[in-house]
């Protein structure tokens, strides 16, 4: 039996993570936020007060990283997000983590993976590919409101600039740049609620799952 794999890509704060978790729960599939794997390496470096461009130690931490220990609450900070985007441009680290992500995708009955290069690099043969995006101003507003809800201070303009910088790094990096796979369905969440986005996604996924079962 071949695992059923759903690849979800998109820029930061596009809503892909929330969508991916809902899809994984709905279809009883495993879930991996691949961004957490890069955050995990960044966190390990920062804990040891090491530079984010320390390739030797970053590679060691990438090889030792246990996906089962990834803690979203610990790794979800704004600062670690920035650090992770810098870790992600180190070729050897990316190759190591991609290999681990591919192994995760082999787990039965299947998985939902979200990130920047799932449909293009990590799982190019995924059964379903979704590319989730939204206007950068809307993404900044969502991130701003998210931070305020946690009781923390936030500056909308700073968040907007940060997202634009992250988008630029993700899109222009030489290895595994952020881009829509040719066979991915585009979901623009700019004017959609998470429930509306989920409904659209399920309408795309359901017939593919049924075809797999019948086939």
From Swiss-Prot:
Pfam families given in the database record: Cytidylate_kin (PF02224)
- Which GO cellular component term is one of those annotated? cytoplasm
Indicate which residues the UniProt annotation says bind ATP.
Answer: 10-18
- Give GO terms: molecular function aspect only: ATP binding; CMP kinase activity; dCMP kinase activity
| Catalytic activity as recorded in UniProt | CMP + ATP = CDP + ADP; dCMP + ATP = dCDP + ADP
**The protein's Enzyme Commission number:** 2.7.4.25
Tell me if ATP-binding is a UniProt keyword of this record.
yes
- Which UniProt keyword terms apply here? ATP-binding, Cytoplasm, Kinase, Nucleotide-binding, Transferase
User: Signal sequence span per UniProt?
Assistant: none
InterPro entries per record: Cytidylate_kin, Cytidylate_kinase_dom, P-loop_NTPase
Taxonomic superkingdom = Bacteria
Keyword Transferase present in the record's keywords: the answer is: yes
Compartment annotation:
Cytoplasm
Q: Name one GO biological process term.
A: pyrimidine nucleotide metabolic process
Question: Which family does the record claim for this protein?
Answer: Belongs to the cytidylate kinase family. Type 1 subfamily.
UniProt xrefs under NCBIfam families:
cmk
**The name this protein goes by in its record:** Cytidylate kinase
């Amino acid at each position: 039996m071949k695992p059923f794999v759903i690849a979800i890509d998109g820029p930061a704060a596009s809503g892909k993570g929330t969508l991916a978790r809902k899809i994984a729960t709905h279809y009883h599939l495993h879930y991996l936020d691949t961004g957490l794997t890069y955050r995990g390496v960044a966190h390990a470096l920062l804990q040891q007060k090491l530079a984010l461009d320390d390739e030797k130690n970053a590679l060691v931490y990438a090889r030792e990283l246990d996906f089962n220990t990834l803690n979203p609450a610990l790794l979800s900070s704004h600062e670690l997000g920035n650090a992770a985007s810098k870790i992600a441009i180190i070729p050897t680290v990316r190759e190591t983590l991609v290999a681990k992500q591919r192994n995760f995708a082999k787990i039965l009955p299947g998985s939902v993976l979200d990130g920047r290069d799932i449909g293009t690099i990590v799982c190019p043969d995924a059964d379903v590919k979704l590319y989730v995006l939204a206007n950068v101003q809307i993404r900044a507003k969502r991130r701003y409101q998210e931070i305020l809800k946690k009781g923390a201070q936030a500056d909308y303009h700073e968040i907007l600039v940060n997202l634009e910088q992250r988008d630029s790094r993700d899109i222009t990096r030489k290895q595994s740049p952020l881009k829509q796979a040719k066979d991915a369905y585009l979901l623009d969440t700019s004017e959609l609620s998470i429930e509306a986005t989920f409904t659209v996604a399920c309408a795309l996924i359901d017939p593919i799952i049924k075809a797999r079962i019948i086939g």
